[in-house]
Amino acid sequence: READFSAPLEKSVVTEFGEFLGKTEHRTRAVFAAYKERDGVALRAAALAGPDVTALLRAVVAATNDGASDKLFAAVPAEWQKDASLAFARIHRLRKANKIEEAAQAMLAAPRDPAELVDPDEWWTERRLIARKLLDKGDAATAFRIAAEHSATGAEQRIEAEFHAGWIALRFLNDPGKAAPHFARMAETAATPLSLSRALYWRGRAAEASPDGTEAAR
């Protein structure tokens, strides 16, 4: 699903292995490609899935290119209106339009199952951008939720997500008890000396700010 095939190679793969590739596989590949802004791949894969998925991906691709319209969203068949990729497209569009509060509420209502999201790390990127905008607006409580409720699966993305949640809790909410578990998860995920030292530093800062000095050890 992550392969960036050229059109001729894609045709060869479909010819040889098409019996093993159904609508679900083509739709998943299309969504993954759209998130990575590989528009040609996304639309070709969508076409293999059928006209309904093509309508869905046209809206998603347009949104990631800042060209989505209400008409494109309305053209998506009813069976796909609640698809996670369309939710992503709507959230992205709201954020780019600087409708940050609406984008945040839509994100909080979005699915969180990594399988449903297709590319949960790309969803984390969108969450991070929204959380930062919320901090600019002084809404640290919602920014914390946006960061803390991530579904990132990549180690680097998980570390960054847990850092953001912990940092917001510590620096903006003044809640070391809420911050400490996120810094602990950073340490659990860390795979390099640098990332581990960063996590332990912030665990120490949370402990220092805790009334009894023990939060980072939990």
Predicted regions mapped to residue ranges:
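Alpha-helical solenoid repeat scaffolds
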Residues: 1-218
